[in-house]
C-alpha cells in the first residue's frame, strides 16, 4: 500500500512538472502566487512581483526555483547565489572579477542582500533599509547622516554618484581612477566663496601640480558629510 501511494505521488509530481513546462511564464508564476503572495511574512518579498523587473522580462518563479527537485533545499533554489543570478546577469560576473569588489564571489554577501529578487518598491529592485534609505547604508551606516553639512551629490544622486556598486578597477569602488578627477566633475571653475559650492581655486600655498596636494581627501576627510565643518575638513 505504501509503495502504491509513493507511485501515485511520483506520478502526480511528474504530471505537475509536465503541466508547468507547458505554461507561459505568467501562468506558472500565477500558480505559485496563489499561495506565495500577500501580507503573510515579509510582504515586500513577493507582493510586488507582478510589477517587478523579473516579471516584466518574462522571468518566472520556475526559472529560479524548482518545486520538486531543487539543487538547493534553501528556498528550493535551482542553484546557489551568485551563480543562479549569473545565469542572466553575466555582465555582473565580470564586474565582480575586478580587483576591487563587494565580496559576493567570496561568499561574504549575496546578490539578494542588496536586491529584492521578487520586486520590492525601489529602483533596480534594491532592498529598502529599515529607515528608508538606500541599500548601501545597511552596511555603511557611518556614511548615512543626517549631517549638519551635507555633501549634496549623496543626497541628490546617491552613493553611485561616486561609487560603482559591484566592482571596479579603482580603490574604494570609485568611478574614476584618481580622487581629484572625481571631485572636479562638480568642483570645476567654481570660486570657493562663503555660502557657495567649493571650487577648484585652491589656496596659493597649495600647488595643485604638487602630488602632495592632488588628493582632495587628504584634507577634506569627511567627504560624506560633517557636523562641524562645511568644508568637510573634520
List where the protein language model places each region.
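Short sequence/structural segments immediately N-terminal
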Residues: 1-234
Amino acid at each position: 500500500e505504501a509503495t502504491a501511494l509513493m507511485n501515485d505521488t511520483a506520478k502526480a509530481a511528474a504530471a505537475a512538472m509536465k503541466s508547468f513546462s507547458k505554461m507561459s511564464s505568467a501562468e506558472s508564476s500565477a500558480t505559485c502566487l496563489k499561495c506565495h503572495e500577500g501580507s503573510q511574512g515579509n510582504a515586500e518579498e513577493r507582493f510586488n512581483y507582478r510589477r517587478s523587473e523579473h516579471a516584466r522580462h518574462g522571468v518566472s518563479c520556475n526559472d529560479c526555483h524548482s518545486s520538486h527537485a531543487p539543487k538547493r533545499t534553501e528556498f528550493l533554489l535551482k542553484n546557489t547565489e551568485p551563480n543562479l543570478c549569473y545565469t542572466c546577469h553575466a555582465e555582473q560576473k565580470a564586474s565582480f572579477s575586478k580587483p576591487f569588489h563587494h565580496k559576493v564571489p567570496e561568499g561574504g554577501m549575496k546578490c539578494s542582500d542588496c536586491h529584492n529578487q521578487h520586486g520590492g518598491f525601489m529602483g533596480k529592485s534594491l532592498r529598502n533599509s529599515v529607515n528608508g534609505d538606500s541599500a548601501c547604508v545597511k552596511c555603511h551606516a557611518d556614511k548615512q547622516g543626517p549631517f549638519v553639512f551635507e555633501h549634496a551629490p549623496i543626497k541628490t544622486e546617491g552613493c553611485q554618484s561616486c561609487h560603482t556598486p559591484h566592482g571596479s578597477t579603482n580603490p574604494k569602488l570609485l568611478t574614476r581612477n584618481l580622487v581629484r578627477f572625481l571631485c572636479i566633475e562638480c568642483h570645476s571653475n567654481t570660486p570657493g566663496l562663503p555660502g557657495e559650492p567649493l571650487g577648484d581655486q585652491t589656496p596659493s600655498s597649495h600647488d595643485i601640480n604638487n602630488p602632495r596636494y592632488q588628493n582632495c581627501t587628504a584634507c577634506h576627510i569627511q567627504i560624506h558629510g560633517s557636523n562641524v565643518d562645511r568644508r568637510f575638513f573634520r
